[in-house]
């Protein structure tokens, strides 16, 4: 089945509004005619209005790095889906490894956020992946199955259609280590098989699974070119327009 790749930039906690606008102004002309893949930028919350305004009318979508599952309320420091949509955001990351690691985000919280995003019509990119100790203990498959199963509780096959999954081998994020294409493909197959078990073969065959773990211009082709890999969630290499352009045009 042909799946349109998504190349996504996770800017994490980098860039000022001026730097973000400069990036978009430089980047858009580089990819203006690029229709093979979808492109999305995920800046930090304070940058969302600036980036969305700068990217308006282009082929580049903009989303949040994190959202809260509540409609509104006394949740200091959080961003609601209503707020995201009010400024024009269309996507959101959910359950990024740094959210799980530093902010105690559990599979149950990921599940609540996924339900909320789908209810609002925001495209969710659900992040899953194992840490180094889990990989070395041979628990990669177990961890991925647990995270997928936990995230998808109560999700119907029909509701699941917009969902994107991003596989992040946590041991390869910001470490300079990269999963080989073979390791990445193996993980993607585990994820797709688990989705098939939960939601059916048709949904699994259509669902996009991105790779996210030290993706750079020099390894993008080898990774995204794999049949099982439907794009990339890019960190550090997405912070410069020319670097991210090379990945988009893998």
Give the ranges of each region predicted by the language model:
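Active-site loop-to-helix "anion-binding N-cap" substructures in soluble metabolic enzymes
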Residues: 1-250
